[in-house]
């Protein structure tokens, strides 16, 4: 059970009510869209207290907005964290999260089995500003241990990997990270808080591309990070940024003065202030609309994905299916531990005949859409090596488990029988 207003409620209740209440002036039930850039101050002293971080409140919509705040409160409640911060996209949240932990000369250890754009951001863009990322096999715990040194600032993994749906052993990775005084960062985009709450397994920070399953309708871009409030920066020699006075706030020491909220406070007041990747109020409103049906959608999507994966697994023209919910999957036991409600809606498969056969399959589909997004109400398909992971080298593709014939399927809300029929006719084409 989860808690709100001093009472314990279930997940489905929180996904509808957490973070909002009827407007006190108009008594409107729905969340208002506060389409504003700025806010009035009660006095000069009031403004000064806000700017000095001595009092909470709205200053400027680059840093906070009431509509966005409601979204942040809801996600924090669903994830089980002490606070959350929404930004313009999942990529923006990821980039800012790592800049909030690391700087030039520092290192991050990351799974290699992640979204191709994330590999490029970590391995190229962060490298250009002096942050080195060591990519390792997510299932090789010894490799994670061996990659740690005195400059390591974070472990990063996707709860369910993109695109091959490998399931991370979050608990074991968090144990290694914490033994070295390092925070565990988990991307929960493919699971959402309904299927998995990484904080319960030791994650310190949880990242979502809310653009995907949280929003659920392909209408709004947004990213969110939740702070578990569990990582103690105070006195940790790896994090001088949290233990030394910050000159831009007249000597604030985030670990000391902000306590458990040091990370999320610094992320808002420095990263969002300086880099400006704020979430638009309308986008926050649209994501909130999607969250109200989250559990219903994720249950349906997971059930349909399992049905489709089983059908493809038995098809004579299908060479492989990577879906962790299948009893034959190497990750099936982890699904029982980490994903008991369902294994999500994204997986990969390939046909005998290589890339040409996979391309013909995609081009022959009539109902399923050829799109690079995932987490939509509609079922989507793509060829990772040509799209989401096209920036990777052949070696990186191999390390990520992406073959030339691999296609990625993101299952939507349609009748699974209709989706299976469309796949069958395209395979036969």
Feature roles, as predicted:
Residues 2-6, 15-17, 21-24, 84-315:
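Conserved PLP-enzyme active-site core in the AAT-like
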Residues 20-22, 35-41, 212, 229-230, ...:
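Glycine-rich beta-alpha junction loops
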Residues 38, 43-95, 117-124:
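Conserved N-terminal alpha-helix of the aminotransferase class I/II PLP-enzyme fold
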Residues 80, 151, 317-320, 367, ...:
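Glycine-centered tight turns that cap/initiate beta-strands
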């Amino acid at each position: 059970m989860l808690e709100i207003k001093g009472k314990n409620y279930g997940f489905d209740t929180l996904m509808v009510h957490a973070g909002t209440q009827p407007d006190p002036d108009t008594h409107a039930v729905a969340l208002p869209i506060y389409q504003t850039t700025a806010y009035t101050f009660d006095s000069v002293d009031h403004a000064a207290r806000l700017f000095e971080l001595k009092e909470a409140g709205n200053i400027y919509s680059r840093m906070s907005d009431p509509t966005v705040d409601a979204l942040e409160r809801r996600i924090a409640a669903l994830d089980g964290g002490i606070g959350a911060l929404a930004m313009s996209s999942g990529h923006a949240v990821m980039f800012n999260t790592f800049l909030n932990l690391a700087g030039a000369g520092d290192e991050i250890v990351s799974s290699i089995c992640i979204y191709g754009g994330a590999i490029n951001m970590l391995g190229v863009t962060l490298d250009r500003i002096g942050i080195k990322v060591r990519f390792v096999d997510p299932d090789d715990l010894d490799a994670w241990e061996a990659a740690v040194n005195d400059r390591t600032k974070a472990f990063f993994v996707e709860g369910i990997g993109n695109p091959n749906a490998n399931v991370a052993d979050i608990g074991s990775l968090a144990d290694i990270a914490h033994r070295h005084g390092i925070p565990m960062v988990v991307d929960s985009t493919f699971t959402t808080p309904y299927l998995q709450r990484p904080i319960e397994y030791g994650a310190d920070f949880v990242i979502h591309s809310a653009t995907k399953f949280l929003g659920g309708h392909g209408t709004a871009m947004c990213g969110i990070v939740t702070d578990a409030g569990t990582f103690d920066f105070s006195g940790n020699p790896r994090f001088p940024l949290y233990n030394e006075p910050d000159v831009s706030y007249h000597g604030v020491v985030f670990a000391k003065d902000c306590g458990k909220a040091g990370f999320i406070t610094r992320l808002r007041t420095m990263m969002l202030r300086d880099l400006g990747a704020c979430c638009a109020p309308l986008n926050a409103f649209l994501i909130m609309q999607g969250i109200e049906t989250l559990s219903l959608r994720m249950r349906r999507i997971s059930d349909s994905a399992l049905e489709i994966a089983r059908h493809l697994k038995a098809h004579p023209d299908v060479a492989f299916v990577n879906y962790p919910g299948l009893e034959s999957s190497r990750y099936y036991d982890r699904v029982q531990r980490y994903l008991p409600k369902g294994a999500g809606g994204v997986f990969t498969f390939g046909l005998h005949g290589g890339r040409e056969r996979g391309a013909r399959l995609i081009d022959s589909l009539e109902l399923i859409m050829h799109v690079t997004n995932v987490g939509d109400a509609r079922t989507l398909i793509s060829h990772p090596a040509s799209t989401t992971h096209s920036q990777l080298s052949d070696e990186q593709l191999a390390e990520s488990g992406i073959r030339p014939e691999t296609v990625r399927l993101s299952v939507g809300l349609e009748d699974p029988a209709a989706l299976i029929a469309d796949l069958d006719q395209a395979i036969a084409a």
